[in-house]
Amino acid sequence: MAQAPSHANDTEQKKLLDILVNSASLSSGDLKALLVAMDNFDVVAKVFLLEGVPFVFSSKPMKYLIFREQVADRFEIGYQDVCIVGSAKLGFSPSPYKFGKPFEETSDVDVVIIPSEMFDNGTHELFRHLHKVGPALSYSNAESVSVDARDWRLHKEAVRNFVYENFNPSHLPENNALRNKIFSNISSTSALFLALEPQVFVSKIRCRIFRHWRAAEAYYVNTLRQLKKQLAAGGIAQETAVDVDLDEEDAAAAGSRG
């Protein structure tokens, strides 16, 4: 005989339904309440992180469509394979390391794009580069090997991103043709972005390339899972070497030097 749903499950589903139906936007408090009540974050990731009109275009949904079309045109993909994520999407950061931080002029606009061929090419280029980074391969397990800390981070981040089927072009060497093409494509949309009069004028637009939408969903579901763990622990996570992308670290360092 099937068991009746528990009161906890009823409460969890009612909380999710109330926010989905009655909320045009999501506050950091709403997101925290959802994460505390739930263990499956697939719907939350899809509805609030990957779909819908982002905070920066909340009063101008048609202008968001124009922006997506322009990005898609640069990368020769469909507009449906482009979306704004992160703090520019929600109005606050969903990152376990910056949770609740409001989106502001110093914030970057993060864009997800899904050109599968570019993911394959970029990953191949990156691992070919990593093959040449660091000391020569040693087959002696008895010998210790010294590796530059930044090179080790690059290896770890490349493997992490490959597991989640995404590619960060900033990990390629600066003289790499594919890196320069991607950066040129995404930076060329900055003037248009500002011309579309977003809620907040921003300094930089970045992109992360995913192999397919399922990979993007899995990546942001994991972000929510890590955020829930951190909230349960009672605070914001401390950034570690394998948790923060090198380009984010460089941006933070540049800001502190300024």
Regions found by a protein language model. Name each.
Residues 2-107, 114-258:
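Catalytic core of pol beta-like nucleotidyltransferases
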